[in-house]
């Protein structure tokens, strides 16, 4: 297959001038030339999804550009890389081609929202979550393409768009990028980003105050609604009932619905079948954990955005160490930079590696250090920390202190109990188990634990 052709190259240059940058980079640039015979131009898209999207949305535009260049009518047909590979045993498998495709950051002409539009857009969107900052890899290519398609043409084919994937993989980023894109294109667009928890709280508040009419107006009179963490609808029967009717009202009016979840619709439990059916009626796109190449690109992009310089071997070390999600990866980057800045140590693998150990404090610390650091961090006195107080702020700080002491010292459970005012070893065991559970589901707890670990690391390093 000839991938470079003078005519297709000219057509691409023409389209580059007329299409938006994100449209060109996402749909036109990846298309490869296959053949041009008898006025028939055959192009190869990376996958079936891209092929179908090009056919439905860009065929006439490409044919018009080709006609202007060739001087006669040109018909364009699209095939996917996968279909081409079936016709030739010498072709590589599509999955291999996608995995080996160089990961790149997606450019967007509407990345940084203008200050004028920011002030008119009180919709809860995080200004950092734009397409420009999203690094596209094999793990997220489909979800990214679907998000862009919805941003460009809301309320059409992919309605709803259901984005699913594990914690910290970029679901919220893509959702909010759609919102930013629409607001930049149309400053008057009514865009609403909301977590399922907030939606639930609003419904409860509406019931208590007899104000459901206002709640319905709030959520049903929008052009684009972005619903995050829909899995938290599980078991909430009345909220599900309200969301069902809200979904129907939005869909019937042509408003775009984008939903995010930690699992696909068919794996959600405790949610009405009629809702599951509606979640599945549009497009479902999942995001997988990023591969090594993508993780490296993410760190390089973050370093560029933060105007920081990290040695390549340190970037590769972090990328190889933190593999499960992007949030954890970027957190490691931030901690490495902060650690080197505070301690004055060089940015090398040797100096940073111990601090980035996700399973331990990294150096042995004393029980007193743990108690003092937890006390300072949570603004709880040491006397309260080792007392029997059951106030939530105190008990939570105490549990985290017990967890850190278990992983940062060589003390047994009974000895840890002694350090916390003579608590029973079963109390210590329960506290550790509770923290371990929360670490996987509560980003706030995970962040608090990690920050205290880093502070303990810094203190210990200063004393070496």
Swiss-Prot record:
It is found in: Cytoplasm. CDD domains: AAA (cd00009), Bac_DnaA_C (cd06571). GO terms for biological process: DNA replication initiation; regulation of DNA replication. Residues 124-340 are annotated as: Domain III, AAA+ region. GO terms for molecular function: ATP binding; ATP hydrolysis activity; DNA replication origin binding; lipid binding. Residues 79-123 are annotated as: Domain II. Residues 105-120 have a biased composition (Polar residues). Residues 100-120 are annotated as: Disordered. ATP binds at residues 168, 170-172. GO terms for cellular component: cytoplasm; plasma membrane. Plays an essential role in the initiation and regulation of chromosomal replication. ATP-DnaA binds to the origin of replication (oriC) to initiate formation of the DNA replication initiation complex once per cell cycle. Binds the DnaA box (a 9 base pair repeat at the origin) and separates the double-stranded (ds)DNA. Forms a right-handed helical filament on oriC DNA; dsDNA binds to the exterior of the filament while single-stranded (ss)DNA is stabiized in the filament's interior. Domain I is involved in oligomerization and binding regulators, domain II is flexibile and of varying length in different bacteria, domain III forms the AAA+ region, while domain IV binds dsDNA. Oligomerizes as a right-handed, spiral filament on DNA at oriC. This is Chromosomal replication initiator protein DnaA. It comes from Prochlorococcus marinus (strain MIT 9301).
